[in-house]
């Protein structure tokens, strides 16, 4: 058995692509438009031949999707948690759970999907402004 992807329904495709590609740094692997089914599938990953997330955009969706408590979050390992969070914050992304411990942070996608960011290797030394930054909202 081989893990392939996780599917996320998105309400605003352009906002979702801006977030996942321009802000989070994923790349588009492939795309499929179905005129008959009236949907678009876009597969994103950290690199070629890596597991993907599938963004599903239903063309006729009128209301934003809601998420239940059965789905938790996506998680990505990053080379430098502080640099990643700073870049995201500079691009308008709210850091819901700052990396106070130098290891873990949480953000949310435009469709309210929680995303965990984990420092590669050992935690970095606690550093300001992150060490004293409060949580914002939930994650």
Where are the language model's segments positioned?
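Short, structured motif recognition centered on aromatic/hydrophobic residues
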Residues: 53-55, 71, 115-117
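N-terminal beta-strand motif that seeds the catalytic metal site of vicinal oxygen chelate
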Residues: 1-17, 71-76, 121-139
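Short, charged/polar surface micro-motifs in flexible loops or helix N-caps
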Residues: 47-51, 60-62, 77-81
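A contiguous binding-surface segment within folded domains or other stable secondary-structure elements
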Residues: 60, 64-73, 93
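Acetyl-CoA-dependent GNAT
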Residues: 57-61, 119-122
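Vicinal oxygen chelate
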Residues: 29-32, 82-139
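Core segments of cupin and vicinal oxygen chelate
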Residues: 7-50
């Amino acid at each position: 058995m081989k893990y392939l992807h996780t599917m996320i329904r998105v309400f605003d495709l352009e906002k979702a692509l801006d977030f996942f590609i321009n802000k989070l740094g994923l790349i588009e692997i492939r795309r499929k438009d179905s005129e008959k089914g009236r949907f678009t599938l876009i597969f994103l990953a950290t690199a070629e031949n890596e597991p993907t997330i599938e963004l599903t955009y239903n063309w006729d969706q009128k209301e934003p999707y809601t998420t239940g408590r059965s789905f938790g979050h996506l998680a990505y390992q990053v080379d430098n948690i502080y640099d990643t969070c700073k870049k995201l914050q500079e691009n308008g992304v709210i850091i819901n759970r700052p990396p106070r411990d130098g290891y873990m942070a949480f953000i949310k996608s435009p469709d309210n999907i929680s995303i965990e960011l984990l420092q590669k290797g050992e935690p970095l030394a606690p550093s300001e402004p992150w060490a004293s930054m409060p949580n914002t909202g939930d994650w």
